[in-house]
Amino acid sequence: MSTFTNPLKSRLKETDPLFGLWLSLGSDAAAEALAHAGYDWLLIDMEHSPNDSGDVTSQLRAIAAAHLPSEPVVRVPSSEAWLVKRVLDAGARTLMFPNIESADEAARAVRLTQYPSAGALDGERGVAGAVRAAGYGMRRDYVQTANAQIATIVQIESARGLQEVEKIAATPGVDCLFVGPADLAASLGHLGDSKHADVQAAMARIVSAADKAGIAAGIFAMDVASAKQHRDAGFRFIALAADVMWMLRATRQALQEVRS
């Protein structure tokens, strides 16, 4: 089988913006269909969506079945070693960790994605050969190549994380800082108001920290206008809302138009 590679990890180092979509429906059919939409990446959400490790595996298969460039990302609900291991064994190559608040937490997230090896003796990932990620044992170089190909994205979504953001960004193995705008706004005392000046200043600080560390900054955008604003502000890894949001917007608009 071909060598295990992660094109998204290398693309995160480039300057061109990468636009993605949140998959919240828990549907492998939706995941496969949306792989045809042309997004750079599709995020399978385990934190706020009804996805367990089996659902994630089904959606990873569905996206792969499209044979198109959309790269799957999986957001795990927490830094639990057993869960991270299952998601990686299922074939995920890029993981997002929520609410990282210190360099130590960021370093732990990275360790969870790494096999113990000469370059990462503190890696915490358990070794299993006959898993989907390794072609069920047919991709024999997987264990040797996986460490260098797994991408780690950490979310900054609290006042505490913001205060440590420069140290988090400088953590070896972190590929991207991703802003959780709703939670960040709430943590800064502005629940429901991510447009507040304090929140905007926090976002600018996160972009600056990422730039200084030579990594990407990402964010969730509610609509096209917001996505363009974030792009112009220096964000390079941008989620253009979620599948369920676009489904409701389009169907409601169509119904309103036909009834008018």
Swiss-Prot record:
Residues reported to bind a divalent metal cation = E157, D183
**Is the keyword Manganese in the record?**
yes
Pfam family name, one: HpcH_HpaI
**Cofactors that this protein relies on:** Mn(2+); Mg(2+); Co(2+)
The answer to keyword Magnesium applying to this record is: yes
Q: What is the active site of this protein?
A: H48
Name listed for the protein in its UniProt record? Hydroxypyruvate/pyruvate aldolase Bphyt_0320
